[in-house]
Amino acid sequence: MRKVQLVVLLIVLTFGCSPKTFNIKWTKEIAPENFTTRFETSKGNFDIALERSLSPKAADRFYQLVKHKFFDNSLFYRVNPGFVAQFGGNDSVAYKKWNSVTVPDEVVKQGNTKGTFSFARGGKGTRTSDLFINLGNNSRLDTLFYNEVRGFPSFGKVTSGMEVVEKLYSGYSDSTMEHFDLMITNRQEFLKKFPDLDVIEKVYLVD
C-alpha cells in the first residue's frame, strides 16, 4: 500500500506541479504603459523597452508571453543580415494554444527603424507569437500592404545590447523559413539542419 502511495505522490509531483503552457485568462492581462524586458541569449544579454500606447494589443500580448515564459529556450530562427532577427515559440502545444487567439491589427504609429521591435504577420489578423527586431532602417515595413493589412506596428526598441543582437548567427538567413513547421514539431531534427542558431535562454520583466 505504501509503495502505491509513493508512486501516486511521484506522479503528482512530476505532472501536477508542472507549469501550464497556456490559460485563456492570460490573454486578458493588460501590460503596463511602459515596461522593459531582458533577453538572456547564447550570445549575451540585451534589453527591450516597450511603450504600450504605440500598439496596445501587441504590447499586451508580448507582456503575456514574457510573463508566462513562452519564449524561454526558443530560437532566433530567422536572422537576415541588415533586415530582421525573428523569433517565437518552440513548444508545439504552447504555440498552437497561443496562436488560437490572434492579436487585433493596429495602425503603425512608430516606424521600423534599427533596433525597433514588431510582431511578424502573414496578413490580416495573423499577429500571434512571432516577433522580429529590425537590424536596419526598414521604413518600407511601415506602409507595406500585404494580404489586406498595411504595415508592421513597432512598439518597442532595444535600449542596451544592440551589439549582441547584431552578433546573432545569420549564416542561414531566410532559408530556415522553409522548415518552420519542423522547428515547431521536431526541434531536434530542425537543429540538425541548422545547428548554429542562437538560443533565447530566458526573457523576463526587469521593471
Name each model feature, range by range:
Residues M1-N23:
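Bacterial Sec-dependent N-terminal signal peptides
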Residues C17-D207:
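Cyclophilin-like peptidyl-prolyl cis-trans isomerases
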